[in-house]
Regions:
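A structural signal for small-residue-enriched, beta-sheet-centric alpha/beta enzyme cores
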Residues: 1-15, 19-22, 26, 30-200
């Protein structure tokens, strides 16, 4: 049975974006990477997609979806240093009336202990800022004034939050990969996944 994966794909493009995994699978297969099933090589590539089709831009690509080529390009240019923000799965993302995008963080839990990392494509529904001051709800997690250094004011408390207009149900998605180098049992992996989901 399959015990591991060869790559994980996050993509925009709604269901069309699942084709990106095909591009990654083809590139892996050419390199002989994948699950061995007799004489066949089957790359194991789970994928998740977000809905960003109503963000403007040209979606009339004709009979050939661009996503397999985008997946292959992502595979070929993959490195430890990668672009955040308007890149990859986060390219067409929006969040609460602002530009969404791709974010990442990792940390070692203790000296010499395991590392936990997260890669998130944010295309979320809802409001991101306090209604009066415009301070981000996450202001207390700000590092080096990355959100502009705006602090909430007393008038924010109890004020109605302005929700951006939604064009329809199911048109916002946030997807993530949460990973660790800790050695986990199957039941520990399940608990890790539950905690990651709750954090999302």
């Amino acid at each position: 049975t399959v015990q591991s994966v060869n790559a994980i794909v996050l993509s925009g493009g709604s269901a069309f974006g699942l084709d990106a995994a095909g591009g990654v699978m083809a590139a892996l297969r050419e390199k002989g990477i994948g699950y061995r099933a007799g004489a066949s090589i089957v790359p194991i590539v789970p994928a998740a997609i977000l809905f960003d089709l109503n963000n403007g831009g040209d979606k009339d690509w004709g009979t050939a979806s661009p996503y397999p080529a985008l997946g292959r390009k992502a595979f070929e240019t993959a490195s430890d240093d990668f672009t955040l923000g308007n890149a990859g799965a986060g390219f067409g993302a929006n969040a609460g009336g602002y530009k969404g995008g791709l974010g990442s963080v990792s940390m070692q839990l203790a000296d010499g202990g395991p590392t936990v990392g997260a890669l998130v494509a944010v295309n979320a529904v809802g409001a991101l800022t306090h209604p009066v001051s415009g301070a981000f709800f996450a202001w207390d997690s700000e590092i080096d004034e990355e959100f502009g250094g705006v602090l909430p004011v007393a008038e924010d408390r109890g004020s109605a939050v302005r929700m951006p207009k939604l064009s329809g149900p199911g048109e916002n998605t946030t997807i993530a990969i949460v990973a660790t180098d800790a050695v986990l049992t199957k039941s520990q992996c399940k608990q890790f996944a539950i905690m990651a989901h709750q954090g999302l």
